[in-house]
């Protein structure tokens, strides 16, 4: 019977302690200390949520009369006791001696006496997180007799000193979000089974860490020291580490050899420190032969560091002061797939034409929010996602994208691109392009030569006054078209403007100067955004060509009572949303003669300029 009960016991433990487990090697629990990541990073970056060893989806019910159980707690015959969140102010004194897994989280405990724990010699998991425990209230000998303890959770308390001694059987320890200033040699030392240690969000400085903090604990795989006051990388780190978090500290340099023994390290987080070019040398990262994820964002670097490991897949360098990418610093990293260089001080001349040569796996490049005055030459040939928004680019040349055949998403928004400076053949090679964003530029007309295979086209907040005949010709695969915030008038949108858009599902012409619902819209259209225009009427035939509409947005126009013909919507069998808020406040909707004449003159002037 003992063997048959072992699995149910394992399947009960710790679900009551905090929820689902994340895929880390050493199951632990604590606070999240991980930044918000883009979807592409999730393949390489596991969250810092310290998961518990989740072993069941059911909480233990209060045990039968034969099982002793403290008041308001839930107990099981297998030794699982849950006293979490019941406003305890004292350690429960009537715990069953066979307790294996004890949860006291989310209470008001301020102290624990050693004798209260000493009789629980079978205890394997102790969850004390989110209480009011102080170092004075947790004596050094508190855990002395817990020789079977594997998992200890003390996050979110008021500890200033770590316990001098912790049991040697520990697998995972969480001290996150305390006020720790001191770690002792045997706090984490001499624990061969220890796999994960969480110390983020404390007040640890270099002097508070012993030189041999993990002596005899060489199997630690996860170490989280983020958000402390460290100026140096801790010495003698465990060689088994595969995840090391040192972000949000005060690191200015990394001494030679700091990472030389960490050949198993896969993820290294160094963002939000004070690292400079001088603080890194050519060998800082060279021995990290397994490193796939490196985050150096939000430091003080002025160039891409040399000597980066060849194994890197994702490299964060954003939010520095980088002005140059030299010819040979990235080219050895043949596994690189994601390069994030946004929010730096890069100009096109600072990026060497050979900077990306040979990087055949590099498919995502972020260069936005820099000082690029043109598209850099020598872009990675296999790039699929290229973000160059928020720069100072004034034009697109014929050869700028001549070698990026695999490009699928191109964002050039919020630059200074004008229509005369955009070459008609600039996109001729982009036959795989699916998304093109030209919003926030200075375009007066839609660029000629738009890729025919684009699914999403954004030209919001430009200076478009008209859609030239044939501007959207051949774009049968276009699904979404955004023309928000331009100067488009109804006279400039003839029924032939949309004739080739057989697949269009979403059209956004909000924030223009339309006075009527556009004619000749494609039957495929499902969502039509017309808010913030000057539309004064909806006639009966307004939507005759668009029977598949699901959403019509007409808020904040000049519709008046009686100017909307109800029958206009009767044939729209799929209509789910009709938004006409912010209308019906203009009397009968008629304009005075002066206003009409003024608008006609403006239209004539703009049409003349366009010609």
Swiss-Prot record:
Residues 585-611 are annotated as: Disordered. GO terms for biological process: negative regulation of cell migration; negative regulation of cell population proliferation. Kidney. Expressed in podocytes and likely vascular endothelial cells within the glomerulus. Residues 60-97 form the LRRNT domain. It comes from the Eukaryota. GO terms for cellular component: cytoplasm; extracellular space. The keyword Transferase does not apply. N-glycosylated. GO terms for molecular function: collagen binding. LRR repeats lie at residues 98-119, 122-145, 148-169, 170-190, 193-213, 219-239, 240-261, 264-284, 290-311, 312-332, 335-358, 361-382, 383-403, 406-427, 432-453, 477-490, 503-523, 524-545, 548-569, 574-583. Pfam families: LRR_8. Keywords: Extracellular matrix, Glycoprotein, Leucine-rich repeat, Repeat, Secreted, Signal. Glycans are attached at residues 215, 282, 411. Belongs to the small leucine-rich proteoglycan (SLRP) family. SLRP class V subfamily. Binds to type I collagen. Negatively regulates cell proliferation and cell migration, especially in smooth muscle cells. PANTHER family: AGAP008170-PA, PODOCAN. This is Podocan. It comes from Mus musculus (Mouse).
